[in-house]
Amino acid sequence: VNQTPKPAGDAAPTAPARNVAALNAVDFSIDGKTIFRGLDIAIRRGEVTAIMGPSGTGKTTLLRLITGQLRADSGRVVVEGRDVAGLGRRELYAMRRRIGMLFQNGALLTDLDVFENVAFPLREHARLPERLLRNIVLSKLHAVGLRGAAQLRPQQLSGGMSRRVALARAIVMDPQLLLYDEPFAGLDPISMGVVLRLIRSLNDALGISSVVVTHDVREISQIADSSYILSGGQVVASGTPAELREHPSPVVHQFMDGLADGPVTFHYPAPDYPAQLLDRSEGT
């Protein structure tokens, strides 16, 4: 995959930090509701990190904390060695340009064709000759297998193709960190397999780091280097997919195996069933 040119510096390169991003003792709440309490997560450089957990545990909120769209109540969110809370507006925008984002719905611009959807970030943020821009866009589309679809409109694409176009757009600025929000949602098995392979292959080919928020345990376990399971505002387990499958926690066991009942119960709390049936004071 071709990368956009970057100016060469005179200084000798220094060894990059082990973590491209980290959340340290993060507390966060919305409207008085606690989302995270003392959250600790490390996104290691060059790896695919999975963020999993039941619905409503704040997985997408975590991505917004990393990008600075939300600010933690306490603790630190660090990206590329810098505390996000301490960045000014210009520095924050510069940081976001080094982060790619694949949204669950793809978020393609319906009035632009595939080529212009992928070209959009370059036209907004880079002053490139048209020929160079064209070559970069085509190379990214080629990387996701859709160079031949450059002139199609979003309405002509399948769900899987739309997701791949959005992925090409997410990598067009050569990000150092790529964030995926439920990338497999709504995809058929073939499309899911294609996106799964692309997440791993692009991560390795581009030398980037990836964070994948997902419920799809079986699929992400095939490619993730490390995984975190969130529940109750905290990390309840972390490790490789193999380590999580052997984890002793009942919550982790229920989630990894997709069990209908367990710590997360099947029945919503209710009075004793026979007693409720006999209670004439309750309305229907």
Role assignments for model-derived ranges:
Residues 174:
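Conserved catalytic motifs of ABC-family nucleotide-binding domains
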Residues 82-83, 130-148:
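Conserved ABC ATPase "signature" region
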Residues 52-54:
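The feature captures the beta-strand-to-loop junction immediately N-terminal to the Walker
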Residues 178-181:
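Catalytic Walker B motif of ABC-type/P-loop ATPase nucleotide-binding domains
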